[in-house]
Amino acid sequence: MQNNCHLSKLILEQAKKYGDRAALSYRDYTLNKWIPISWKQFALNVKKVSLALLRLGVQVQENIAIFSQNKPETHFVDFGAYGIRAVTIPFYATSSAAQITYMLNDAQIRFLFVGEQPQYDTAFSVISVARSLERIIIFDRSVKKNPNDHLSVYFDDFLNEQLADGVSDDLLNEYKKRLADANDEDLCNILYTSGTTGQSKGVMLTYGMYREGFRVNDAVLPLSENDVFLNFLPYTHIFERAWCYLGLTEGALQCVNLRPADVQRSMQEVHPTCMCAVPRFWEKVYQAVLEKMENGTFMERKLIREALEVGKRYWVN
């Protein structure tokens, strides 16, 4: 059943309901297996981020940027920011230095979270021209920092650094107040367009917009806590972002595909019951099926044709 609470409180509320049940899963490329993250762990990380950002002095509706490929940490930062009524702005992981510079300055970003080496290198290269940038926080511990970099910190060190002295009553009270004050008119995200017709434009999305989208989707295509989602499109894409959040409201398991090239492998491993993708992806899947059919035996070709017809009758006719 869909949880209709405000997104700023969603993960905390779902953790009360689902506890140690897996909320997220991601592939560990060193261990070569999928690692689950429980709702309880998810909520703990979200609250840590909220308190760490508050300790840094992040203001209500201040913009925070995330420059990363899909990772569980992006969810931690998103929902941690929502918990203190800050606004998150995701950048495409392939954005150029010029694009990053423009968005950082346009949104007056003080704190930038980055994913892996390519994003860090790009972010570090624009420090001198990013007028408001104060800190870069790096998700991936394997990133090699520039020897002259005195602005960056690893994500786990950032949390430990900000919370090392404990949480004061004043900080905790401010956190509780912001959670209580969160409303549907607050800005949730700013998503920058691709910039194909000039400079990128920042599209402002409120919590109320997401809430209405969830309501409509639930009426047309209801989901449940038994569903398994596979994240494929970047979280910068509003289709994927809204779909991910929809899954979280339903209590479904989200499998985070870290590398786009691995999506077919991920599908075979996690067996998603639902996912969103652009038409080009399904065209490629369909073409692969046709090629396999042409190279198969008579019986294999017959079975594939029959399966396609069944799908067509069910979904199209």
Specify the residue positions occupied by each region the protein language model found.
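Conserved AMP-binding/adenylation subdomain of ANL enzymes
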Residues: 211-228, 235-317
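Conserved AMP-binding A3 loop
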Residues: 36-39, 188-214
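Conserved pre-ATP/AMP-binding loop-to-beta segment of ANL
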Residues: 19-22, 138, 165-192, 199, ...
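Structural core segment of the AMP-binding/adenylate-forming
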Residues: 51, 56, 83-162
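A short N-terminal helical cap/helix-turn-helix that marks the beginning
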Residues: 2-25, 44
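Flexible, low-complexity linker/hinge segments
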Residues: 1-5, 120, 147-187
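Conserved AMP-binding/adenylate-forming core of the ANL superfamily
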Residues: 24-71, 78-79, 96-101, 154-157, ...
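A short helix-loop-beta submotif of the ANL/AMP-binding
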Residues: 62-63, 69-89, 93-97, 105-111, ...
